[in-house]
UniProtKB/Swiss-Prot annotation:
Domain spans labelled tr-type G: 380-551
Name the record gives this protein: Translation initiation factor IF-2
NCBIfam families assigned to the protein according to its UniProt record, in alphabetical order: IF-2, small_GTP
Cross-referenced PANTHER family: TR-TYPE G DOMAIN-CONTAINING PROTEIN (PTHR43381:SF5), TRANSLATION INITIATION FACTOR IF-2-RELATED (PTHR43381)
Transmembrane segments: none
Residue span of region G4: 491-494
Localization (cell): Cytoplasm
Gene: infB
Annotated signal peptide: none
Family: Belongs to the TRAFAC class translation factor GTPase superfamily. Classic translation factor GTPase family. IF-2 subfamily.
Region of interest (G2), ranges: 414-418
List of residues binding GTP: 389-396, 437-441, 491-494
Domain of life of the organism encoding this protein: Bacteria
Species the sequence originates in: Rhodopseudomonas palustris (strain BisB5)
Molecular function GO labels: GTP binding; GTPase activity; guanosine tetraphosphate binding; translation initiation factor activity
Length: 883
C-alpha cells in the first residue's frame, strides 16, 4: 500500500482525549431523626467545580481555598495539537512517496483549517462565558453562606431569649401560686439546666476541615445533612450515619418545629421545647390567673331608639346570653338578633351597673337652628313686613307704590300668584324694610301661612269700598297664630264709595280694635293709586320695629326660610330665601329640608349678583341639588358630611311619612273592593308648575273638588317644564297634563301629539280649577227626576187577537201619554214598571187622554193585567250634575 500523504505536510490533529463536561453534582443520602422515633431520609447533593481542559494534572488541594476566595481565571483556549513535521531523513526511512496535492485537496484542507479556526474562536468564547458564570456562582455561594451564618446566630439568640422568658415565667408563677416543685425541675419534667445545652450549641462543621466545594454548597439546601470529610485519597464524600435518638420519655413535651439549617446540622443535640408547648404553658398560667376575682368594668353605653341584643351586649362588654337571661327573668323571650326599644335597653344596662346615654336619630339636627346668640354680639336688623289681605284689595299695588315699581302689570290676570320678597329704603329715616307680598286667593292659604311665620309685622290691607272679606279673616288668624303685631292699611280711600269707618267697625268682630276706637292696633288710610299717606305707613312700620327691638348676630352661620322654590331650565334649582340670622355667603354648604348644596350664586331682589346676604335680606340661592320645599328652614353647616347626615335623616323621615299614609289607605285589595262598592271614578292628572308654592296651591284646590263619586287622581306633580317622561306616564293612564306657567319641550310636545295626549297650559289658577271642575262634572252620573202625569183605573180586560190583552181604563186624574213610563199597582203594591206601548180612544191611536175619559192601554212585554189595578203614568227627566 502506498501512502499518498506528501512528506512534510502539516495536518490537523485532535488531542488524544475529547473535551467533555463531567457532572458537577455528587449525591449522597443521610437520615435525620426527630422526636417520637420519626426519621427522614434526605438526599444531599455535592456540587463540584466544572473544569475545562485536557489531561493536565489535578490541582493541588492546598490551592482549594484560593478558589473560594477569588474567581478562577479563564483557562487558555484549547487548541488542536499539531504533529511535528518529519525530516527528509525520516521520510526516506519510512519509505513514503511524496507527491504534490491537487487543487481539490488544497481547497479541502483550507476549508478544514478555516473550520478549525472558527471552532477555536467559539470554544474560547464559551470558555470565557463559563468562567464568568463560575465567578458569579461563587459570589452567590458566598452570599448564601453569610446569610446562613446570620440565620444561625439569629436562631441561637431567639432560643436564648425564649429560655430566659420561660425561666422568668416559671419564677413568677412559683412566687404567685407557691408551687412546691423543686427549682431544678420546670413544669414539663425536663432538667432545669437545659439552658446549658441550648445556649451552647455544638460547634458547626467549619469550612477548613472539609473541601470548600462542600462548604460552598452547604447553604443551598437547609435540609442537607452533614457530610463526612473526604479522606486523604480524595475519595467522594459519604453521608454520615444518622445519630441515635434517645428513647422518648413518658410525659416529655412534643418536639415539633421547623427544620432549618441549624437544626439539620445539630440533629444529634438535645432539642429544646417547641413554641406550641410554651403557648400551652402560658395558657395554663392564664387559667390560674383567671380564678382571681376581676374588677367590674363600668362603661357609658350609648343607647339609640332601637338596638339589637347583640349590639347592646357588645357596647356593655357583656355576654349576649347574660342579656337574654335578664330579659327572660322579665318575662320576655328574645333571640340574639332581636331588636329591643331604648327603655328596655336602658333597664338592662343600669341593672348590669353601666351608665346609659340616650340618643335619637334626630340628634343630627341638634345645633342647626335656634342657637342662642351672645347679647354683646347682636346688632339691630331690618324689620320683615308681610302684606296680607283679600284678593283685589290692592296689596301688590301698595307695594309697587312703596318700591316705585310696577309688578302688577307683569302678573297674569292682574292677580298675584307667587310669593315675592322685596327690600325698600325709607326716604326719611334711611332704614331698610323687607316686604313679603302674599297672594290673596283662597287657594294660597299655605303661602299666607308661610309669610306670617317669617315676618315681624303684618300689614293687613282692607279695601275701603269692599270691607272685611273671607281672606281678610284668614290673614287675621294667621297673624294671631304667629304672634306678630298688625298694622291695618285701609286702601282705596280715593274711591267715592269708600267707607273707612265701616272697615274699622267690621274689624271689631274679629278682635281687631284700632287706636281710633280705643285699641292698640295702628291703622292708616292710604291710596296706592294716588300714593296717599305712604310716608305715614312707613313711619308706623319703623315705629313698630323700634318697639320690637329687633337684633341679631351677623357674624354667625346663616339661618333662613325658603319662601319659594322652583326648577329653572337654565340655572337649575333656585330657592328664594329670607335670611333671618347670620350672613349667607357664596361657597357656604347649606341644608334645606331634604336637599343640600353649595351656594354658587346669590341674586338680590333687584337682579344683581351679590357675594353675601345679611339678616332680613331676601335673595335667590343657586346651588341646591334639587328644589327644596317651600317653607323649609335653611341652615349653613360646617362640612358636606354633616349635610349628608341631616339630609339622609330627613329623607328617611319623609319616606316613613309617605309609607304611613299609604298604609292608612289600606291594601290594594281593600282599595279595589272599596272602588267596586262605592263606584268612585278617578280623573287622572299630571300637574307641572313653575314654583313650589303654585304647585301646592293647585294640588290643594284639586283635592277640594273631590266627592264620593268622583275625585282628581294626581299621578305626578312637580316643578319644572313638561318632559317626555310625563307624556309617557300620561299615555299609560290616559291622563291629562296640566302645565301652570310652564311649557313642554320639543320632544314632549311631539310625543304628546303622536300619542294623542292632551296638554293644557294655564297662567291663572282660577281657569285651571274651573276647567278641571267641568271635566270632573262630566264623570258624574246624571240625576233622574220623575214628573207625575196622571192615574188611571182598569175597568175591564179585552183579548184582541192581533194586539193581545188590552186594558179598558178610565183616567181618574191628570193625563196619560203614549210612550210614557207607567207603574202597575195592585193592592198598593207595584207589580210592574215599564212603558205604555198602546193608547187608544175608541179605535183611534191618540197621544194623550185627559182626565175623566176612557181609553184602552197596552204595556210593552207585559200582559198580566187585572180589573181593579191602578196605572200611574209619569215622565223621567235627566238632569246633568256639576261639582
Amino acid at each position: 500500500m502506498v501512502d499518498t500523504k506528501t512528506p512534510g505536510d502539516k495536518t490537523l490533529s485532535m488531542p488524544t482525549k475529547t473535551l467533555t463536561l463531567k457532572p458537577r453534582v455528587e449525591q449522597g443520602v443521610v437520615r435525620q431523626s426527630f422526636s417520637h422515633g420519626r426519621s427522614k431520609q434526605v438526599v444531599v447533593e455535592k456540587r463540584g467545580k466544572r473544569r475545562v481542559g485536557g489531561d493536565g494534572p489535578a490541582e493541588p488541594a492546598a490551592a482549594a481555598p484560593e478558589v473560594v476566595k477569588k474567581p478562577t481565571p479563564a483557562p487558555p483556549a484549547v487548541s488542536p495539537r499539531q504533529q511535528p513535521r518529519p525530516s527528509p531523513q525520516q521520510q526516506a526511512r519510512s519509505g513514503m512517496v511524496l507527491r504534490t496535492l491537487t487543487e481539490d485537496e488544497r481547497s479541502a484542507r483550507a476549508t478544514a483549517l478555516a473550520d478549525a479556526r472558527v471552532r477555536e474562536v467559539e470554544e474560547r468564547r464559551l470558555a470565557e462565558i463559563e468562567a464568568q458564570r463560575r465567578a458569579a456562582q461563587e459570589l452567590v455561594d458566598k452570599a448564601e453562606r453569610e446569610a446562613a451564618e446570620v440565620r444561625r446566630k439569629a436562631e441561637e439568640e431567639r432560643h436564648r431569649h425564649e429560655e430566659e422568658t420561660k425561666r422568668k415565667a416559671e419564677t413568677e408563677a412559683k412566687k404567685r401560686f407557691g408551687e412546691a416543685e423543686p427549682a431544678k425541675k420546670p413544669a414539663d419534667g425536663r432538667p432545669a439546666s437545659t439552658s446549658t445545652t441550648t445556649t451552647a450549641p455544638r460547634a458547626p462543621v467549619t469550612t477548613t476541615t472539609r473541601p470548600p466545594a462542600v462548604a460552598a454548597e452547604a447553604g443551598d439546601d437547609d435540609e442537607a445533612p452533614r457530610m463526612v470529610r473526604r479522606g486523604p485519597g480524595g475519595g467522594p464524600a459519604r453521608p454520615a450515619p444518622p445519630p441515635k435518638q434517645p428513647a422518648a420519655k413518658p410525659g416529655a413535651s412534643k418536639q415539633r418545629g421547623r427544620l432549618t439549617l441549624v437544626t439539620a446540622l445539630t440533629a444529634d443535640d438535645v432539642r429544646e421545647r417547641s413554641i406550641a408547648s410554651f403557648r400551652r404553658r402560658t395558657q395554663r398560667l392564664k387559667g390560674h390567673a383567671s380564678n382571681e376575682p376581676k374588677e367590674k368594668l363600668v362603661r357609658e353605653v350609648i343607647v339609640p331608639e332601637a338596638i339589637s341584643i347583640q349590639e347592646l351586649a357588645n357596647r356593655m362588654s357583656e355576654r349576649a346570653v347574660d342579656v337574654i337571661r335578664m330579659l327572660m327573668k322579665q318575662g320576655a323571650m328574645h333571640k340574639i338578633n332581636d331588636v329591643i326599644d331604648a327603655d328596655t335597653a336602658q333597664l338592662i344596662a343600669e341593672e348590669l351597673g353601666h351608665t346609659v346615654k340616650r340618643v335619637a336619630a334626630s340628634d343630627v339636627e341638634e345645633g342647626l337652628f335656634d342657637v342662642v346668640d351672645n347679647s354683646t354680639d347682636t346688632e339691630p336688623r331690618s324689620p320683615v313686613v308681610t302684606v296680607m289681605g283679600h284678593v283685589d284689595h290692592g296689596k301688590t299695588s301698595l307695594l309697587d307704590a312703596l318700591r316705585h315699581a310696577n309688578v302688577v302689570s307683569g302678573e297674569a290676570g292682574g292677580i298675584t300668584q307667587h310669593i315675592g320678597a322685596y327690600q325698600v329704603t325709607s326716604p326719611e329715616t334711611g332704614t331698610k324694610i323687607t316686604f313679603i307680598d302674599t297672594p290673596g286667593h283662597a287657594a294660597f292659604t299655605a303661602m299666607r301661612a308661610r309669610g306670617a311665620k317669617v315676618t315681624d309685622i303684618v300689614i293687613l290691607v282692607v279695601a275701603a269700598d269692599d270691607g272685611v272679606m273671607p281672606q281678610t279673616v284668614e290673614a287675621i288668624n294667621h297673624a294671631k297664630a304667629a304672634g306678630v303685631p298688625i298694622i291695618v292699611a285701609i286702601n282705596k280711600i280715593d274711591k267715592p264709595d269708600a267707607k273707612p269707618e265701616r272697615v274699622r267697625t267690621e274689624l271689631l268682630q274679629y278682635n281687631v280694635q284700632v287706636e281710633s276706637l280705643g285699641g292698640d292696633v295702628v291703622d292708616v288710610e292710604v291710596s296706592a293709586k294716588n300714593k296717599t299717606n305712604l310716608d305715614k305707613l312707613l313711619e308706623m312700620i319703623a315705629l313698630q320695629a323700634e318697639l320690637l327691638d329687633l337684633k341679631t348676630n351677623e357674624s354667625r352661620p346663616a339661618e333662613g326660610t325658603v319662601i319659594e322654590a322652583k326648577l329653572d331650565r337654565g340655572r337649575g334649582p333656585v330657592a328664594t330665601v329670607l335670611v333671618q340670622r347670620g350672613t349667607l355667603k357664596v361657597g357656604d354648604i347649606i341644608v334645606a329640608g331634604a336637599e343640600m348644596g353649595r351656594v354658587r350664586a346669590l341674586i338680590s331682589d333687584q337682579g344683581d349678583n351679590v357675594d353675601f346676604a345679611g339678616p332680613s335680606v331676601p335673595v335667590e340661592v343657586l346651588g341646591f341639588n334639587g328644589p327644596p320645599e317651600a317653607g323649609d328652614r335653611l341652615a349653613v353647616v360646617e362640612n358636606e358630611a354633616r349635610a349628608r347626615q341631616v339630609t339622609s335623616y330627613r329623607a328617611h323621615q319623609k319616606r316613613e311619612k309617605a309609607a304611613s299614609i299609604v298604609g292608612m289607605r289600606g291594601s290594594l285589595e281593600q282599595m279595589m273592593s272599596q272602588l267596586k262598592t262605592t263606584g268612585r271614578k278617578d280623573f287622572p292628572l299630571i300637574v307641572k308648575a313653575d314654583v313650589q308654592g303654585s304647585l301646592e296651591a293647585i294640588l290643594g284646590s284639586l283635592e277640594k273638588l273631590g266627592t264620593d263619586e268622583v275625585a282628581a287622581r294626581i299621578l305626578h306633580a312637580g316643578v319644572g317644564g313638561i318632559s317626555e317622561s310625563d307624556v309617557t306616564l300620561a299615555e299609560g293612564f290616559s291622563a291629562v297634563i296640566l302645565g301652570f306657567s310652564v311649557r313642554a319641550n320639543k320632544e314632549a310636545a311631539a310625543a304628546a301629539k303622536r300619542n294623542g295626549i292632551e296638554i293644557r297650559y294655564y297662567n291663572i289658577i282660577y281657569d285651571l280649577v274651573d276647567d278641571v271642575k267641568k271635566a270632573m262634572s262630566g264623570l258624574l252620573a246624571p240625576t233622574l227626576r220623575e214628573t207625575m202625569l196622571g192615574n188611571a183605573q182598569i175597568l175591564e180586560i179585552f183579548n184582541i187577537s192581533k194586539v193581545g190583552k188590552v186594558a179598558g181604563c178610565r183616567v181618574t186624574d191628570g193625563t196619560v201619554e203614549r210612550g210614557a213610563n207607567v207603574r202597575l199597582i195592585r193592592d198598593n203594591v207595584v207589580v210592574h214598571e215599564g212603558k205604555l206601548s198602546t193608547l187608544k180612544r175608541f179605535k183611534d191611536e191618540v197621544k194623550e187622554v185627559q182626565s175623566g175619559q176612557e181609553c184602552g192601554m197596552a204595556f210593552e212585554n207585559y200582559t198580566d193585567m187585572r180589573a181593579g189595578d191602578v196605572i200611574e203614568c209619569y215622565r223621567v227627566e235627566t238632569i246633568q250634575r256639576s261639582l
